Regions:
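C-terminal catalytic histidine-bearing segment of alpha/beta-hydrolase fold enzymes
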Residues: 236-239, 243-290
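Primarily recognizes the serine-hydrolase "nucleophile elbow" in alpha/beta-hydrolase
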Residues: 128-215
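Conserved alpha/beta-hydrolase "acid-adjacent" motif
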Residues: 229-236
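Active-site glycine-rich loops that stabilize anionic/oxyanionic intermediates
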Residues: 80-85, 226
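Short beta-strand/loop motif that positions the catalytic acidic residue
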Residues: 222-224
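N-terminal cap/lid segment of alpha/beta-hydrolase-fold proteins
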Residues: 12-71
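Short beta-strand element of the alpha/beta-hydrolase
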Residues: 72-81
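Catalytic nucleophile-loop/oxyanion-hole region of alpha/beta-hydrolase
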Residues: 87-90, 95-96, 110-145, 264-270
Length: 290
């Protein structure tokens, strides 16, 4: 029997389910089959390879429930990075869901559409997928044991950019499909880990309009390394905008570590960020069951 939203039950993790009842908005087909595009020459991270999933035309979500005896009632939608070309689905996805479960947080892994669609903004299709995913989670909050008022997002690199754009969006970017689209898609908090594209590439110092910060932006946790080739100005400018808007935020810029480390430990202090993130969640009361 095919798995549907109605038949989804708690597991560790559940089987991935499609976000859309038919084709996703604007999809024209023609992509090769979805596949891991990893190459033998790719760099290792923390001594291990990184999955690089490409050609995603059927976006999905997979629910990773925290153990019942430690569950806090907090849920996080995880958005992997990959420049909007691929998804680092283990490094910045499944491994992150496992960590969130270890601190009592339910995780939902978003596999959004990549690569960039011709004739559209790089984030356009992924944003539709993220908006849809949040609506689905809130629609099924009771069935899945989710507190709809304690639902955040966590994104890496392009996934961090996606989270920021999601938080800034005024309305849905696609016509209503069903009841899931009647629920708010705005997250209650966000964690942006080495986010990309928040400022203009090549020297921008102010947050781009699509990621604009307002007093309605949710409380934010930011991490980056000073030697990140993406440029730490992304988090510095975003952090300053949060401060000016009086949005609660915590910003960590570490001396070294580069880009794309996920939460795998390395010699660089930046990879201790999960402990800082857990402290931040705890301080906000999100690691204590209501």
């Amino acid at each position: 029997m095919a798995l549907t939203l109605a038949s989804l039950t708690l597991g560790a993790p559940t089987t991935a389910i499609p976000l859309w009842p038919g084709a996703a908005p604007g999809e024209k087909g023609g992509l090769p089959p979805e596949a891991d595009t990893i190459k033998p020459t790719d760099n290792l991270v923390g001594g291990r390879t990184v999955a690089k999933i490409g050609n995603v035309s059927t976006p999905t979500l997979a629910f990773y429930p925290a153990p019942k005896d430690t569950a806090t009632g907090t849920t996080v939608l995880v958005c992997p990075g990959g420049g909007y070309y691929i998804l680092a689905l283990d490094l910045e996805g499944t491994e992150v869901c496992t960590w969130l479960n270890s601190i009592g947080v339910d995780a939902v892994l978003l596999k959004y559409r990549v690569p960039r669609r011709a004739g559209r903004e790089p984030s356009a299709a992924p944003l539709e997928d993220a908006q849809r995913a949040i609506g689905i989670i809130r629609q099924h909050a009771t069935e899945w044991g989710v507190n709809p008022g304690r639902l955040g997002v966590l994104g890496f690199s392009a996934g961090g950019n996606l989270c920021a754009i999601l938080s800034a969006s005024a309305g849905r970017d696609y016509p209503r499909v069903d009841a899931a689209d009647d629920y708010s898609f705005h997250p209650d908090f966000q964690l942006l880990i080495y986010p990309a594209y928040l400022v203009k590439e090549g020297g921008g110092t102010t947050v781009l309009p699509e990621s604009a910060v307002t007093p309605a932006t949710p409380p934010t946790f930011l991490v980056m390394a000073a030697d990140d080739p993406i440029d730490a100005t992304n988090v510095l400018a975003y952090g300053q905008a949060l401060k000016q808007a009086k949005v609660p935020m915590e910003l960590h810029v570490y001396p070294s570590g580069g880009h794309g480390y996920g939460l795998r430990p390395t010699k660089d202090e930046v990879t201790t960020w999960p402990a800082r993130a857990a402290d931040w969640l705890r301080a906000r009361g999100l690691l204590t069951a209501p």
